[in-house]
């Protein structure tokens, strides 16, 4: 609901004495606000993003796109106190067209699917809109194609393997520790078995590979499946567990004789990703090319 601002005006003393007069007008959203379109708005993370963007300073929700719940008010779908008067639509192009006519700064958040993300960013770019992409399992060749597209169009795009600031801090701590320990194993738990090892686990293993360190020299065998999967050529072992009911958890164990260093991070709720998402929105509007990884802005 728009806020109402009331301004009082005292009449000049040179005129006839009179009571003060006032006028009221419903305030409109600032023209400087970042207009945000959420593609995949009906998903759990999309709904959390709707709430976060609506409450954030300097940005406003301009569109909700999804193939499910078409026609429903996105505010009511997200259990907000009042409707946002923004219906869910299935046509991204229609929303992009309405925003681009106002020549306002716009960002499309993409929570969709690896198979559609390139076309989504291409459409957003054609309408002069920046993109934030959080699509697990996105292929490296897709990222390369997006990078070429953004370079040609001089348009910003942020591809984020994770929006979790805690996860990024864990990865940074792991890289630092890898220079001081020769033994490392990663244990993760996920509520479902959609992707194992998870993209995050693979990224952590890749981050600490090719740093001139060979890990777990005394147990380099890959014959025993119970010892986990070796990722990369430097011996990083990953153990993946599927435990419904528990939070998504990542633990990295480093050890040397008489010393164990453990780094752990849990994601209990999708809302934990929202600070990272809002940071991504604020940073991508200044970009003129593709940047891979939210950690570039921490």
Swiss-Prot record:
Residues 1-25 form a transit peptide. Disruption phenotype: Impaired chloroplastic NAD(P)H dehydrogenase (NDH) activity, probably due to a reduced stability of the NDH complex. Pfam families: DapB_C, DapB_N. NAD(+) binds at residues 160-163. InterPro entries: DapB_C, DapB_N, DHDPR_bac, NAD(P)-bd_dom_sf. GO terms for biological process: diaminopimelate biosynthetic process; lysine biosynthetic process via diaminopimelate; photosynthesis, light reaction. One of its GO terms (molecular function) is 4-hydroxy-tetrahydrodipicolinate reductase. It is found in: Plastid, Chloroplast stroma. It comes from the Eukaryota. Expressed specifically in leaves. Unlike DAPB1 and DAPB2, DAPB3 is unable to complement an E.coli dapB strain. Belongs to the DapB family. This is Dihydrodipicolinate reductase-like protein CRR1, chloroplastic. It comes from Arabidopsis thaliana (Mouse-ear cress).
């Amino acid at each position: 609901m728009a806020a109402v601002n009331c301004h009082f005006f005292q009449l000049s003393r040179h005129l006839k004495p009179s009571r003060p007069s006032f006028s009221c007008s419903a305030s409109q959203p600032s023209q400087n606000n970042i207009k945000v379109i959420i593609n995949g708005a009906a998903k759990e993370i999309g709904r959390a993003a709707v709430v976060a963007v609506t409450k954030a300073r300097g940005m406003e929700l301009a569109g909700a796109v999804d193939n499910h719940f078409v026609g429903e008010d996105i505010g009511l779908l997200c259990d907000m106190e009042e409707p946002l008067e923004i219906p869910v639509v299935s046509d991204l192009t229609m929303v992009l067209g309405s925003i681009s006519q106002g020549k306002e700064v716009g960002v499309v958040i993409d929570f969709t699917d690896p198979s559609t993300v390139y076309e989504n960013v291409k459409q957003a770019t054609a309408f002069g809109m920046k993109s934030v992409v959080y699509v697990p399992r996105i292929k490296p060749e897709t990222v390369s194609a997006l990078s070429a597209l953004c370079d040609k169009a001089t348009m910003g795009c942020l591809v984020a393997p994770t929006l979790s600031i805690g996860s990024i801090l864990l990865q940074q701590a792991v890289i630092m520790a890898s220079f001081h320990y020769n033994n490392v194993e990663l244990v993760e738990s996920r509520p479902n078995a959609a992707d194992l090892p998870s993209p995050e686990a693979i990224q952590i293993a890749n981050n600490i590979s090719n740093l001139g360190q060979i890990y777990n020299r005394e147990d380099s065998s890959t014959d025993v499946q119970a010892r986990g999967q070796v990722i990369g050529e430097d011996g990083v072992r990953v153990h993946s567990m599927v435990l419904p009911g528990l939070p998504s958890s990542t633990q990295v164990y480093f050890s040397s004789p008489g010393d164990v260093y453990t780094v752990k991070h849990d994601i209990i709720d999708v809302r934990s990703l929202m600070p990272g998402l809002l940071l991504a929105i604020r940073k991508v509007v200044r970009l003129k090319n593709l940047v891979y990884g939210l950690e570039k802005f921490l």
